[in-house]
Amino acid sequence: TVAVGTSGVAAEQYTDFSQPELTPTIQQQNVVSAGDTHTFSVMIQNRHDGNTNMDRRLGGIATVVETHRITLGAASGVSAKFTDDGTPFEIKTGAQSIGTITAGNGKQTSLTVEVASDAEPGVYQVPVKLQYSYIQGINVDTGDYYINRDEETVTKHLNIRVEESVRLTVDTVQAEDLYKNADGTM
């Protein structure tokens, strides 16, 4: 996407050599058992290193950045979609709109999984498809400016561990002198 406008400044250029790097992580223990339904808190961090290149003066670029409320290094319009490919999980969370994540910061979202009752113990990777846009560059020339935006889709993974668990089922109970809500030995 390219935005075009007018500005009264000599040629200047901003180029961002590194796009935002989004990294999802589970914020608490990532352990579940077969048959469980669990909601995880997921932090999506923008680990953009802030490596930029400025050409000439900053004045015209600063004006464009301020006018359009641009945050350099930010991932904008971030969305996350979790999938259950190759896992014993049923993903109960739909695609989520996260918003803008500025460089060095993160935003919370959630992931709800239903674990298959016959899930084997082990560590499983849940794919997370992240879509976002970012400012790739700004060119300011006499009377004009160009904002170059790029869109990106990346797939990252969250590790979730299924622990071995014992599930007992009581089929029948026989006892004398038992009634509802009573205490006793069986």
Task: Give the label of every model feature segment.
Residues 2-186:
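Long beta-sheet-rich domains in secretory-pathway and surface-associated proteins
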